[in-house]
C-alpha cells in the first residue's frame, strides 16, 4: 500500500513525468494499492476526488484530512484542519471513493494547532455524518 504526500505531484527531473503518474502506470496493480491522503493531494496541487476516481479498484483506503488556508498567520498560511473546516469538497470526495470502491476511510489530522484533538475529531465526525457517511 502506498500513502501519498505532496512530492508525488512534482515532475521527475529525468523522466519529465509526474511521480504519481509513474507510480500508477509502472507498478502492477496486483503488487501495490494506494492510500490517498486528501490533504497532501491538494497540497501537491491536484484534486483529491479526481485522483481517487483515477485509482478505481486500487484505492481501498482514503485518509480524510481537510486543507485550510489561514491568512492571519503569515509564517504558515496552509493548515491541516478538521473535516468541514477547510477548503476541500468532501461531498465530491465521498462520491469519488464510492465510485472507486474504497473500503475504508480514516479521519486524520496531524496537527491540531493547540486545539483539543478530540474536539477536532468530533467536528470531523459530525460533519461527515451530516454528509451521510456512516
Set out the residue ranges of the language-model regions.
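Conserved anion-binding
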Residues: 1-10, 19-20
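Histidine-acidic metal/acid-base catalytic patches
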Residues: 17-36, 40-134
Amino acid at each position: 500500500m502506498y500513502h501519498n504526500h505532496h512530492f508525488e505531484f512534482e515532475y521527475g527531473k529525468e523522466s519529465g513525468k509526474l511521480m504519481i503518474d509513474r507510480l500508477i502506470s509502472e507498478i502492477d496493480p496486483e503488487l501495490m494499492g494506494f492510500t490517498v491522503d486528501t490533504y497532501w493531494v491538494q497540497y501537491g496541487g491536484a484534486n483529491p476526488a479526481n485522483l481517487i476516481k483515477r485509482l478505481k479498484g486500487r484505492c481501498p483506503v482514503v485518509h480524510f484530512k481537510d486543507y485550510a488556508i489561514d491568512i492571519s498567520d503569515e509564517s504558515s498560511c496552509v493548515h491541516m484542519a478538521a473535516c468541514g473546516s477547510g477548503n476541500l469538497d468532501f461531498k465530491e470526495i465521498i462520491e469519488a471513493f464510492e465510485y472507486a470502491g474504497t473500503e475504508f476511510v480514516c479521519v486524520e489530522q496531524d496537527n491540531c494547532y493547540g486545539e483539543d484533538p478530540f474536539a477536532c475529531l468530533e467536528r470531523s465526525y459530525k460533519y461527515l455524518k451530516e454528509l451521510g457517511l456512516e
